[in-house]
Design a protein with these regions (language model features):
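Single conserved hydrophobic/aromatic residue that forms the stacking wall/gate
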Residues: 209, 214-219
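ABC family nucleotide-binding domain
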Residues: 2-207, 211
Length: 219
């Protein structure tokens, strides 16, 4: 099992008040699944993504990622998990504007201290997987929105993560580019990548396999 969350609560302190965001969330995901978590604005999707992505910790409950108890991890251990086990894809791409597509995809490998030759080979392979072998030297302002998101996906998969975590990945794209990105996620999942997508868009859920989605609701 790649993910297991039991009795997850999350609250934030605002002055003297504690504001609940997640309440008794239970969720599990097997390796190789493609699942969408769907919910309206304000339902806690981003908070849940931050917990699953090891960017934040729950207030109560247990969370295991690939068998590791995340709440027991130090900040350095969580950083290593983010680098080596999770690939992130965001709505706004988060590409370095002055760097080429190749350099953007190489970035996680720099942090992992991968040798230069191997770094380039792996980044080129990732760009080829997303259909951008002919755009390796292009900078973000020379790419379409759909191409920028594919660069971001290549960056997310270059470290061969256990989990690909996508937060509203088509939110900034037109319908055609969005459909192409969703088809790419589907192909990556067919190749064995575990994909967890967080969305409010019912149309994107149709691309997921087997167990279609879990729904978050307002507290």
């Amino acid at each position: 099992m790649i993910l297991e969350l039991k009795g997850i609560y999350k609250e934030y302190q605002q002055g003297k008040m504690k504001v609940p965001v997640l309440k008794d969330v239970n969720f599990s995901m097997e390796e190789g699944e493609y699942v969408a978590i769907m919910g309206p604005s304000g339902s806690g999707k981003t908070t849940l993504m931050n917990i699953i992505g090891c960017l934040d910790k729950q207030t109560e409950g247990t969370f295991f990622l690939d068998g590791v108890d995340i709440k027991a991890c130090s900040e350095n251990e969580m950083s290593d998990i983010r680098l080596n086990k999770i690939g992130f894809v965001f709505q706004s791409f988060h590409l370095l504007p002055k760097q080429s597509a190749l350099a953007n995809v190489e970035m996680p490998l720099n942090y992992a201290r991968v040798p230069k030759k191997e770094r380039r080979e792996r980044a080129l392979k990732a760009l080829d997987r997303v259909g951008l072998a002919d755009r390796v030297d292009f900078k973000p302002n020379q790419l379409s929105g759909g191409q920028m998101q594919r660069v971001a996906i290549a960056r997310a998969i270059v470290n061969n993560p256990k989990l690909l975590l996508a937060d509203e990945p088509t939110g900034a794209l037109d319908s055609k580019s969005g459909a192409q990105v969703m088809e790419l996620f589907q192909r990556l999942n067919d190749e064995g990548v575990s994909v967890l997508m967080i969305t409010h868009d019912a149309d994107t859920v149709s691309y997921t396999h087997l167990r279609a989605h879990e729904t978050l609701r307002h507290l």
